[in-house]
Amino acid sequence: MRIGIVAGELSGDQLGATLVEALKKKYPNAEIEGIGGPKMEAQGFKSLYPMDALSLIGFLEILSKGLSILNIRRKIIKYFKHNKPDIFIGIDAPDFNLTVEKKLRASGIKTIHYVSPKIWVWREYRIKKIRKATDKILAILPFEVEYYKNRHNFEAIYVGHPLAKNISLEIDRSKYKKRLGLENVELPILSVLPGSRTTEVTRLLPLFLDAIEKLQESGYKFKAIMPLAKPSLKPIFDQYNSQIRSLGIEVLETNSHDVLKASDLSLLASGTATLEAMLCKLPMVVGYKLSKLSAFIGRILIRGHSYWAFPNILHKSEIIKELIQEDCTVDNLFYELKRLFDDKQRNNYIVQEFKKIHEHMVVDTEEKIIEVLDSIIEKS
């Protein structure tokens, strides 16, 4: 069996790694190739192009590197047309993958899109392309199935999120503190995750650091830890090394999973990390900033959606504070961090609500995906 997969960024690499591992167990001799990151490659995946080349965000970044991405997309389509897989799976990255899927499906290759494009937030017109591009949408958020059915009469299948299955309902924080060498830390631990993309970290890290500095100057005592999401971000961290050191922030060359599981509270960028932090039952403050042009265009295209952070979307209310664009200032971050440290009753409520959401999300994701994959291949 031959399986094609394209994942476009760190979160896609995480999803892809667990999927490739499950596929290898089910089909030991399967050839699985395409575009993926180091976690997928560690499971035996063959990446034809570096995944980092697709990890862009915002309209300015797309304009500056768009030709390179288009060239890779053209080559990957040509490759799979000449080396036809039994099925192709596009993981997230809809602006890249839907075109790949559409071209491959038109040539007779069965396709799956794993992680629904957020058409329930913006650019709903993409449903037309989705219909042409994919045999099945695999949704990782429970409400998406109902959205597709009721609004577009299109079948999406809820497969859960592997993080919901892999993260325990009850977190033994002492275990992860010990793993990170923090077992003797008695202060509250604040994890700081300013993003996984260069543009995110460049915009958010200085704001996060200044807010933490104000918090410390106000007398709050805590231990801050920050994972280095990938080596390519180290030059940005190095620019702020003196401030990071003066604030006593420990930069850990480890994955975000362990850092979040060892934490009591979190300050982080909007994105998949907020879902992970929610599953780790962490009260949090979320910040995010796009370039001015990206934000301007985004507001034109976005469809009246109230929330950016996954916990708020899933809870259908602002259970955690999200500070987006002009609201993402040092003063606002500082104020919300103070609330995070001070309001224990609110934090307890947040933790209990996160547990309820987590319980609802648990599904054997990889088994469900393989079940869908098998049914599609059998029909071909």
Swiss-Prot record:
Question: Is-annotated flag, keyword Transferase?
Answer: yes
Q: Which GO terms describe its biological process?
A: lipid A biosynthetic process
Its domain of life? Bacteria
Instruction: Describe which pathway this protein belongs to, using the record's wording.
Output: Bacterial outer membrane biogenesis; LPS lipid A biosynthesis
| Its EC number(s) | 2.4.1.182
Q: One MF term from GO for this chain? A: lipid-A-disaccharide synthase activity
Which reaction(s) are listed as its catalytic activity? Answer: a lipid X + a UDP-2-N,3-O-bis[(3R)-3-hydroxyacyl]-alpha-D-glucosamine = a lipid A disaccharide + UDP + H(+)
- Alphabetized UniProt keyword annotations: Glycosyltransferase, Lipid A biosynthesis, Lipid biosynthesis, Lipid metabolism, Transferase
Query: What Gene3D superfamilies does the database record attribute to this sequence?
Result: Glycogen Phosphorylase B (3.40.50.2000)
The cross-references to SUPFAM superfamilies, in alphabetical order and at most eight, read: UDP-Glycosyltransferase/glycogen phosphorylase
A GO cellular component annotation in the UniProt record: membrane
Family (UniProt): Belongs to the LpxB family.
Which HAMAP family does this chain map to? LpxB
Q: What job does this protein perform? A: Condensation of UDP-2,3-diacylglucosamine and 2,3-diacylglucosamine-1-phosphate to form lipid A disaccharide, a precursor of lipid A, a phosphorylated glycolipid that anchors the lipopolysaccharide to the outer membrane of the cell.
- What is the protein's given name? Lipid-A-disaccharide synthase
Q: Which organism is it from?
A: Francisella philomiragia subsp. philomiragia (strain ATCC 25017 / CCUG 19701 / FSC 153 / O#319-036)
Gene designation: lpxB
